Amino acid sequence: VLTAIMVACMTAMSVRPPSGASSPGTGPGDNQSMSDADIHFYFDPVCPFAWITSTWVRKVQAQRDYTVDWRFISLRIINSAVDYDRAFPAGYDAGHTAGLRLLRVAARARAQHGGDAVAALYAALGAAIFDQPNEPGHADGGYRGTRAFLEPILARAGLPAGLADALEDTGLDDELRRESAEALALTGKDVGTPIIQFRPPDGVAFFGPVISRVPTDEEAVPLWDNVVGLAAFPGFAELKRSLRERPQLRSFGAAAD
């Protein structure tokens, strides 16, 4: 089950050897807009590990003068050529499709209300998806891509209910494809979410950090400094282990703090 959870945040290409150099025309910076943020954080709202890492990043923001540009990577788009029935456990097609629909709304929110709206929307989405037990009858991840699920979340985020119209707007998918390709051009194509770029637009980027629980306020900054230290070394590429605990989130059965 845990392997299936982790696969949910990955591209199916992650089972293959690393692809090496980026494809021509999609190198770092080719599609990036100018940003003065300290990091670019690429997320899909249905990935539990991206949510845990984003919560950690927000704790760091609260203790330091630290800016984040919340950007998009769609698990459904980066797996668009994949046979979901063979590559993923049952139900992940619906879940990833819901993530794509929610990212359309995030893209519309950014276009109309700016980056702060994306930050507020992602915070509200993650809290609704992961920080409370799953509602009976809503175990199907596809429910998260519906107006019934989204409209109360928009209200909690202080955003107009009309943004829910973007759920169906496939015209936004080109923007999401470009930004997903931008993220993978920074790391290689054998990863998933989250992807973090330090000191954009020219700084190094990595898939992760993948952690299974949110650090405490006291742990957040020292742990982050360790990650930044690794990222500062130009030869650093990967630090990984396959053994991990389930995400410590209420949606996965963890007790409330």
Where are the language model's segments positioned?
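Structural alpha/beta surface segment adjacent to cysteine/selenocysteine redox centers
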Residues: 51-150, 226-230, 238-241, 248-250
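Short, Lys/Arg-enriched N-terminal segments with co-localized hydrophobic residues
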Residues: 22-33
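C-terminal cap of thioredoxin/glutaredoxin-like
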Residues: 56-60, 135-257
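Low-acidity, Ser/Thr- and Arg-rich intrinsically disordered low-complexity segments
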Residues: 3, 9-23
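Local sequence-structure signature of Cys/Sec-based thiol-disulfide redox active-site neighborhoods
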Residues: 35-56
